[in-house]
Swiss-Prot record:
SMART domains: LRR_TYP
Name of the protein in its database record: Putative leucine-rich repeat-containing protein DDB_G0281931
Record's subcellular location: Membrane
Main location: membrane
Membrane topology: Multi-pass membrane protein
Biased composition (Low complexity): 1110-1141, 1183-1205
GO molecular function terms listed in the Swiss-Prot or TrEMBL record: protein kinase activity
Region (Disordered): 1109-1141, 1183-1211
Domain of life: Eukaryota
Gene Ontology biological process terms in this record: regulation of innate immune response
GO CC annotation, single: membrane
Length: 1211
């Protein structure tokens, strides 16, 4: 029963191996179709070789097992009791409950109840049995070799292979088993050396200990076992050389040392193994050549030394081995002639691939007719295939791949009766396809043709698959055809479908054309890529194909295409995307396009891939067009951080409403430029009203400055401070960003000070270059208007005098006033003129196209452009006329008239240039023009965001503050203070904008705090300027009103001073310290009180008022003086009546009193006087003094602590 059961298991196992082998061969065939000979293929080949070896070895082992199984097992006789105990102990030690099969174990008697894997027999005919066999291979046994097993002394067979045993095998454990002939420990994890094997009984026949972790060298003691015929040591960790004592294994039939690390050479003593049939030495590190004594092995059938380092010429080595069937020398360095194999009649397998052979065997006479496999791939074979190869009629598989063969396949290949597979890939066959297929097309068993990587050319013909003479189909068993990487041309014919068993077709990397026929839908694998002329004109796929959802990306492409699969069929298809015009392909991320035409997304843009979509981020402009952008240009950021370029960051790129042109920088119709922004033009009645208001304001200002005397005008110093501050502040607002949105109010309100009249939207006058032309014409317009007005006024007076009969007197004052007005206009226009002129110079070069465009008008091209050239000629001309001419004109006027500045005529004409400054710095207006010039250079001629521009701006504003502190140029103290504070505010604002710009770029910190501080500082200074402006308006009022205003101002200031003094006194008392503990301190001048030389009072202050008439004479007439004295007395009486809270109010005093503490010197007309009212405040009395400062010496005025300069002299 057990014998039959074991026999059936063996038959099933052999069938399983054969089936697995067949499947593996097919798999290897499929895998090798599209791959070069590489490491992966080597692994597959090694796996295949291993299975083949195991099958061969298993056949030899079966002979032993059948011999050992001839003894009948007496199941009716119980087992000796002590052996049952041993088996139970083994069950416990080896954790029997976890075995895959523990049938009947521990139930009754092992022999009678047939415990799984146990065989029994009686040797003495007694009433008890003994255990003679343990066969528990593949039973999931885990543990060490138990020493209990040594007591089973009657054991003949021990097979515990393919389990989980580990550890070392105890020495002597098998020594007492005198009948032990078969040991199989393979495929476990046993360790240690092989010393235990020296204590085996002499009865040992088979020792299979392969695929463990045994270490050390090959022992020499195996020769002491007289009947050992099978020795398996493969796949361990053995090292060293093959000892010569191996030659003493007289009965050995199979010797397997494969897959170790054995070195050295093959000992010649191997020739003594007369019974040796199989010798396995694969995958070691053996060197040298094959010893000639191998010819002594008359019974040798198989010899394998695959993948070693052996070499040499094999001629004459195996001529005396008549039974030799298989020679496996792959992966070595053998060379020489191969004709000697023709003498080996029984040779079936020749595996000589990966060596250094240079020619094929030429068996002209005798040939091995039983040859099945001839493998000579990866050698150095050249020339043509000899026709004598066809004499080996039994060949089933011929592999000549990866050599240097040329020519064609000889017609003698038709002699092969069982040809199954042919591989001539990676050679240099340069024949037609017909010359390759015709010699083999009648092979009825042929399944695989591999001819890739050659130079085969030509087309497919019908006679390749159809025999018209015999009217039969050819190549009906063909399963795989690989003709890739050749030069095939023409269409793929539909008659390839006449090969019914064709499964895999590889025609890739050829020059095929046309379309794929729908008749090939039955294939399982189809490789057709890299056929440049293969494709459909309409971009469609064959009916049996469709794109899958899996996209494949090539390293050299910027798009991914779907893999093509069978429509309703399981077909693996490799087809170029050009076949369907890339219509199913999608661009990669960061690329855009359709149908495989994908361009890289321009820098700073975003392309999601999969189509032509591109997202141009806000603030960038696509070039050369929105539809096909190749690169992006950074757009101008508006003054308040906005951008006109794609503000919504949408895929549909648009400029913001009101913008157009390059960089979205040009205003469309109905919009005007306000800095870098385009604002909507006022329309309807609103535009008319704005225009009328502007015209009326400018006419009123013109008439005011022409008709009024300079002493009656708004104090010039205040006007200049306001104009300079707001002109520069507006320039910063227009050229820098990002300003807080709050400042848009300041920008709109101050634009007109820089003559930005674009908001008028009069036709195209608000656009460049028209606005530039209007600007440079303004000074001439003022001149023409002045001339026309003065001429009209002179004509009016002439006609009036004529009608009244009075002689006409030419009024020179009007001409003087006209000159003064035009100089005033040039002064105020200088900064705007510089800005408009300098903006035309800078051009920015496009780094991609090389074209240049104006930096401040990016839509206008520089260079070869008629408009730009005309404007540049005007710009250069007016740079000389205005930018250089105005300061030069002012300098000439000042230095030419420097000794006549007190002259009434000079004062009337050019007084606006110097009247506001102290006499010692009468030239300071040139400094003011210089700082305007450099501000315009730094923000209009140079890129406002460049480091050089930053340096110039900081230098200009900083030097302005320093010069203001040093020179104190203005006559009025408050003007000096306001000018210094204004420059400080400009400096602070500029620094804040630099910080805000940096924060906007890095986005590391919040900018809200800086925005709030900046807004507060600018608003506070604006309020201060407004108060100063309102204060200066009192000079347009009657003198009585001015006196009342002065009184209230004096009263308020006095209250503030008294309050502050009391507070300071209290603080000093609180903060007083003991003198012994204090350090000596130095009183800082900045906190010292300024006291008038003429006053010795508790507190004092000064109030200057300019005389009302510039041409009035100070009368020396005593009567007039007396009258004036009387007036003064009356005024004093009135003052006494108005004294309140010990505060004395200054009433109107006539500065012409020569008898009232005056020196009585005659004052010539035009000597303008300032009446200095020095008020002494005493809480205990009502005393006061009136002192008139008539000193004309400017240096004395500078030394006066009250700084009562002769401001009137400049008037």
């Amino acid at each position: 029963m057990n014998k039959k059961f074991i026999f059936i298991l063996l038959i099933v196992f052999i069938c399983f191996l054969n089936i697995s082998q067949s499947i593996r061969i097919n798999n290897n065939k499929n895998n090798n179709i599209n791959n070069n000979y590489n490491n992966n293929n080597n692994n597959n080949i090694q796996t295949k070789e291993k299975r083949e070896r195991n099958l061969i070895k298993f056949k030899e082992i079966e002979k032993i097992r059948k011999f050992l199984g001839n003894v009948e097992s007496l199941t009716t006789i119980p087992l000796v009791s002590n052996e049952k105990i041993i088996l139970e102990k083994l069950y416990s030690d080896w954790n029997g409950k976890d075995w895959d099969d523990n049938t009947n174990w521990l139930n009754g008697d092992p022999c009678m109840n047939q415990w799984y894997g146990i065989e029994c027999n009686s040797f003495d005919g007694g009433i008890t049995n003994n255990v003679i066999s343990i066969k528990m291979s593949l039973n999931n046994i885990v543990g060490e070799m138990s020493t209990e097993i040594k007591n089973l002394v009657h054991l003949q067979t021990l097979d515990i292979s393919n389990n989980g045993f580990y550890g070392e095998i105890p020495i002597g454990i098998f020594q007492q088993m005198n009948n032990l002939s078969y040991i199989s420990l393979n495929e476990n994890e046993f360790q240690g050396d092989l010393e235990w094997a020296s204590y085996l009984p002499d009865s040992i026949v088979t020792l299979w200990i392969a695929m463990n972790q045994f270490q050390g060298t090959i022992p020499t003691f195996f020769s002491k076992y007289p009947i050992l015929d099978l020795l398996f040591l493969e796949e361990n960790l053995l090292i060293g050389t093959i000892p010569p004592e191996v030659g003493d294994l007289k009965k050995i039939k199979l010797l397997d040392f494969g897959l170790n690390t054995i070195t050295g050479t093959l000992p010649s003593s191997i020739g003594n193994l007369s019974y040796l049939e199989q010798f396995w030495l694969y995958d070691n590190q053996l060197e040298g050549s094959i010893p000639l004594t191998m010819g002594n092995l008359q019974n040798l059938k198989l010899f394998e030394v695959t993948r070693n380092q052996l070499g040499g010429d094999l001629s004459g080595v195996f001529l005396n081995n008549p039974n030799l069937k298989s020679l496996r020398f792959s992966g070595n360095s053998f060379y020489g002639d191969l004709d000697w194999i023709c003498q080996l009649d029984g040779l079936r397998d020749v595996h000589f691939d990966i060596n250094r052979f240079e020619s094929l065997p030429n068996c002209l006479g005798k040939a091995p007719l039983q040859m099945n496999e001839l493998l000579l791939a990866d050698n150095l074979i050249s020339g043509t295939i000899p026709s004598s190869i066809g004499n080996m009629i039994g060949i089933e598989y011929i592999n000549l791949a990866r050599n240097n063969l040329t020519g064609t396949i000889p017609s003698s290949f038709n002699n092969f009766s069982n040809l199954n597979r042919i591989d001539i890939s990676s050679n240099k066959f340069n024949c037609s396809l017909s010359e390759i297929l015709d010699p083999i097309k009648h092979q009825t068993h042929l399944t695989i043709i591999s001819a890739q990587y050659n130079e085969i050319h030509g087309e497919f013909f019908e006679n390749m698959v159809w025999d018209g003479v015999q009217q039969i189909e050819l190549l009906t068993k063909i399963f795989i055809i690989n003709l890739s990487h050749n030069k095939l041309s023409g269409p793929i014919p539909e008659y390839l479908s006449w090969m019914p068993n064709l499964n895999d077709l590889d025609l890739s990397y050829n020059n095929l054309s046309g379309t794929v026929p729908n008749q090939l839908s039955f294939l399982s694998t189809m490789y057709l890529e890299n056929n440049p002329f293969l494709g459909s004109s309409d971009g469609s796929l064959p009916l049996f194909m469709e794109p899958s959802v899996i996209f494949i990306h090539k390293d050299t492409e910027s798009y991914a295409c779907p893999s093509i699969i069978g429509k309703g069929f399981d077909i693996r298809i490799s087809l170029d995307s050009t076949y369907y015009n890339n219509s199913f392909c999608l661009c990669d991320y960061n690329y855009r396009g359709v149908n495989g035409s994908c361009k890289i997304c321009p820098q700073d843009s975003y392309c999601p891939g999969g189509g032509n979509d591109i997202l141009i981020p806000s603030g960038y402009y696509p070039m050369p067009s929105n539809e096909n952008p190749e690169y992006l240009l950074k757009c101008i950021i508006s003054n308040f951080g906005y951008t006109s370029c794609n503000p919504d960051s949408s895929y549909n790129y648009t400029c913001q409403d009101g913008y157009q042109g390059r960089l979205c920088s040009k205003c469309v119709d109905g919009y005007f430029h306000k800095g870098t922004e385009c604002s909507v033009c006022p329309t309807g009645p609103q535009s008319i009203v704005i225009f009328i208001v502007v015209v009326v304001v400018f006419i009123a200002l013109f008439l005011f400055f022409v008709m009024t005397d300079p002493k009656r005008s708004l104090p010039s110093s205040t006007r200049k401070t306001v104009m300079y501050y707001y002109q520069v502040f507006n320039l910063l607002l227009s050229k820098l960003s990002p300003w807080p949105s709050f400042f848009s109010i300041f920008y709109s309100g101050s634009s007109w000070l820089n003559f930005s009249f674009g908001f008028l939207c009069i036709n195209n006058l608000s656009r460049w270059p028209n606005l530039f032309i209007v600007m440079i014409c303004l000074p001439f317009a003022f001149l023409v208007i002045s001339i026309v007005f003065i001429a009209s006024m002179q004509l009016f007076h002439y006609v009036k005098s004529s009608l009244n009969g009075v002689d006409y007197i030419f009024n020179k004052k009007l001409i003087y006033s006209g000159v003064r007005v035009n100089l005033l206009a040039l002064n105020f226009l200088y900064l705007p003129l510089c800005i408009y002129i300098f903006q035309n110079y800078p051009c920015t070069k496009d780094q991609v196209t090389g074209e240049s465009f104006m930096s401040f008008f990016p839509w206008q091209e520089c260079g070869d452009n008629s408009t730009h050239n005309r404007i540049m000629r005007l710009t250069i001309a007016f740079t000389i006329i205005y930018v250089i001419g105005i300061p030069l004109l002012f300098a000439i006027l000042l230095f030419y008239n420097r000794k006549r500045l007190d002259n009434p005529m000079i004062l009337t004409m050019i007084g606006s240039i110097y009247i506001d400054y102290r006499k010692s710095v009468y030239w300071y207006e040139l400094v003011a023009l210089g700082r305007r010039f450099f501000m315009a250079v730094s923000l209009a001629l140079i890129d406002p965001k460049s480091s050089f521009s930053i340096f110039v701006v900081l230098l200009v504003i900083g030097s302005s503050i320093i010069s203001q502190i040093i020179f104190k140029p203005y006559v009025y103290r408050i003007s000096n203070y306001s000018e210094t504070i204004g420059n400080s505010v400009l400096l602070f604002s500029y620094v804040c904008i630099l910080i805000l710009s940096s924060l906007a770029t890095t986005k590391l910190y919040d900018s809200q705090g800086i925005e709030i501080i900046l807004s507060v500082v600018v608003v506070v200074y604006t309020v201060l300027l407004l108060l100063l402006f309102l204060f200066s308006l009192k000079y347009f009022l009657p003198k009585k009103w001015q006196t009342v205003i002065d009184y209230h101002i004096i009263k308020f200031i006095t209250w503030v001073r008294i309050t502050s003094n009391n507070l300071i006194s209290d603080i000093k008392d609180i903060n007083s310290i003991d003198g012994d503990d204090s350090f000596e301190t130095t009183k800082e001048p900045i906190f010292e009180r300024t006291v008038s030389n003429n006053l010795n009072v508790l507190g004092s202050f000064e109030l200057k008022r300019r005389n009302s008439q510039i041409n009035s004479n100070c009368n020396n007439n005593n009567n007039n003086n007396n009258n004036n004295n009387n007036n003064n007395n009356n005024n004093n009486n009135n003052n006494n009546n108005n004294i309140n809270n010990n505060i004395i109010s200054a009433k109107q005093l006539d500065c012409n009193n020569n008898n009232n503490n005056y020196n009585g010197e005659k004052i010539t007309p035009g000597d303008g006087q300032d009446c200095l009212i020095s008020l002494s405040i005493d809480n205990s009395g009502t005393n006061f003094n009136h002192n008139n400062d008539n000193n004309n010496n400017d240096d004395n005025n500078d030394n006066n602590i009250n700084n009562n300069e002769e401001f009137n002299k400049n008037n």
